[in-house]
């Protein structure tokens, strides 16, 4: 799932399914109630109008922009993400998808920084040692029992 504030930051999270029960908690954690949100016509967004000022673009009807209502900002980000993955990594592991999303979110969110500012920000965020175990387990909820069962 992904959201982006116009002119602002993108926030991303791997979710199991794009349905109401996964999308709405993601929105609640990341978007203030009463905010304007603009989505496509995916059924998962049908009832978000109760918590947000919701406007929909109907891509199925070839509608892409209606005044200030559009989803071009997040679609631009998904395009950058896909090109970045294909051009840099070619293939990514589903196990590490959240890590890749966070890398590209950092790049997007620091798009107006100079290279020196981006480097300083990255260093300030990484002021502690990370173990290999933590690096490879990020975002995963696998127990030892589950890992053994998969082998």
Where are the predicted features?
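Residue-level recognition of single "structural anchor" positions
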Residues: 1-151
């Amino acid at each position: 799932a992904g959201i982006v504030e116009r002119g602002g930051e993108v926030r991303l999270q791997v979710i199991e399914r794009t349905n109401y029960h996964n999308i709405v908690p993601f929105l609640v954690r990341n978007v203030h109630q009463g905010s304007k949100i603009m989505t496509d016509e995916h059924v998962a967004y049908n009832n978000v109008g109760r918590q947000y000022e919701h406007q929909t673009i109907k891509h199925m009807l070839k509608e892409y922009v209606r005044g200030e209502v559009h989803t071009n900002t997040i679609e631009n980000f998904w395009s950058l993400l896909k090109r970045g993955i294909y051009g840099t990594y070619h293939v990514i592991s589903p196990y590490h998808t959240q890590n890749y999303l966070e890398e590209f979110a950092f790049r997007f969110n620091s798009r107006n920084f100079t290279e020196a500012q981006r480097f300083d920000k990255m260093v300030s965020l990484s002021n502690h040692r990370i173990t290999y175990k933590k690096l490879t387990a990020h975002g995963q909820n696998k127990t030892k029992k589950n890992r053994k069962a998969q082998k």
